[in-house]
Amino acid sequence: MNRQQELRSAAVYALIVIATCIAFGAIVVGIHEHIHSTTAYLMDHMASPFAIERGNLVTLDGWDEGVSYSALFPAGKGTDAAIIAVMPLIMHTAFVIGGLYVLLSGIISRKKWLFHLTFWLVVVNLMELFAYMPGRAFSRHGDIGNINHGLGLSPWLLLLLTTPPWSCSRCITCTGGCCPG
């Protein structure tokens, strides 16, 4: 293969990666919101698990699970609200752990496209987890805010328990030129 063919092949694969991430992003957000609504439905806090607000499939803006958290807290159902809020995060964690197991086990190592799909499914779910923690530990609304409020947790506790140690290790050890001076 000559240089021009290699560049063309790389460009095509880059477009496939972008399309895969956009598609998985939309699918994962849809599943995320449905897990909220299904959990609320199973706990008898929602009339239908399909009553979610669907948003934009590309920008992922406007999606909402339709759970009335504002009615749960005054009714003394904070723990229920926290359970409803945390369930999609458990799903993202399960997808990451399961996907990593499949990728590292070698089960699909010779199946290029299945490996590709599994890898990017893991990446998209990991991005969702990082978007929630540590980024939203101090949020007063949304999933993390509902978990903190519902369980009466300090955001500092959630931040410390859910921030992966390796994300801080570079600056803690001052390797790689990250320290001033």
Question: Which sequence ranges carry the predicted segments?
Answer:
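Short secondary-structure boundary micro-motifs
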Residues: 11-13, 67-68
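Select transmembrane alpha-helical segments in multipass membrane proteins
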Residues: 14-19
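Small-residue-rich helix-interface/hinge motifs
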Residues: 21-78
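Metalloprotease/metallohydrolase-associated module, dominated by Zn2+-dependent proteases
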Residues: 63-177
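Membrane-helix boundary/juxtamembrane motif in polytopic membrane proteins
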Residues: 179-181
